[in-house]
């Protein structure tokens, strides 16, 4: 969208990634480049914005509605900082101008409600689709919102996978650029099944 009116030039600069902190510097660099490289230019106006792209997912899967990109955060075992990495990644993306959601898929140790400082129960208008909770600018859903804090989880295998699929697909995510999935620790059937059924665009593996 380039417009030229005599010595006045204006155009749009659109980033396809979260870069709110870089917009001002890029705008100034673009203005300086036009003034130094194009003769006769007196005034330059640059409209710098962010429009995050949707990236490719696994074959046979389609991106979820209202979610551009899903990033899975996993680890080979518990206690290595996976959930901390997931929440810090989410908050960093929010700080850079992205719309971010967090799915706490760690059924046996849901920690995202505590990390995001969110309490209470999510609401549902129709008894099926659940509105996500929100904290620090992050839309969040966790099994921790739906059960009592001291209730032990005795689910295994297919029950866990089914519950996580419901949390993923029956949450009313609102126009997300990124959905961060805090995976259960380990590399068992649950993780393999989720990786085959969830349209993941990227992954972070937290190692020891």
Regions found by a protein language model. Give the residues of each.
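Conserved catalytic-core segment of NTP-binding enzymes
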Residues: 28, 61, 170-173, 177-178, ...
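Gly/Ala-rich phosphate-binding loop of Rossmann-like dinucleotide-binding domains
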Residues: 35, 90, 94, 195
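Residue-level signature of catalytic and energy-coupling elements of molecular machines
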Residues: 34, 67, 78, 104, ...
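Walker A/P-loop phosphate-binding motif and the immediately C-terminal alpha-helix
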Residues: 70-107
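Short, basic phosphate-binding NTP loop
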Residues: 37, 42-69
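Short glycine/serine/threonine-rich phosphate/pyrophosphate-binding segments
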Residues: 79-89, 110-113, 183-191
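Phosphate-binding loop that captures ATP/GTP phosphates
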Residues: 93-157, 161-169
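A short interface-forming secondary-structure element
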Residues: 2-35, 40, 47
């Amino acid at each position: 969208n380039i417009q030229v009116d005599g010595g006045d030039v204006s155009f749009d600069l659109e980033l396809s990634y979260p870069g709110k902190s870089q917009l001002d510097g890029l705008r100034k660099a673009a203005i300086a480049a036009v003034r130094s490289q194009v003769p006769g230019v007196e005034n330059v106006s640059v409209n710098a914005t962010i429009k995050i792209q949707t990236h490719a997912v696994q074959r046979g899967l389609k991106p979820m509605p209202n979610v551009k990109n899903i990033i899975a955060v996993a680890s080979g075992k518990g206690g290595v900082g996976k959930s901390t990495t997931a929440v810090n990644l989410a908050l960093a993306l929010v700080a850079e101008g992205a719309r971010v959601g967090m799915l706490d898929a760690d059924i046996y140790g849901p920690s995202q409600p505590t990390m995001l400082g969110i309490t209470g129960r999510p609401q549902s208008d129709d008894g099926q689709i659940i509105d996500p909770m929100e904290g620090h600018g992050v839309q969040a859903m966790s099994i921790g919102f739906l059960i009592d804090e001291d209730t032990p989880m005795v689910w295994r295998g297919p029950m866990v996978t089914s519950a996580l699929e419901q949390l993923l697909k029956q949450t009313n995510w609102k126009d997300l650029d990124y959905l961060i999935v805090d995976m259960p620790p380990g590399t068992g059937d649950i993780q393999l099944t989720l990786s085959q059924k969830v349209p993941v665009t990227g992954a972070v593996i937290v190692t020891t």
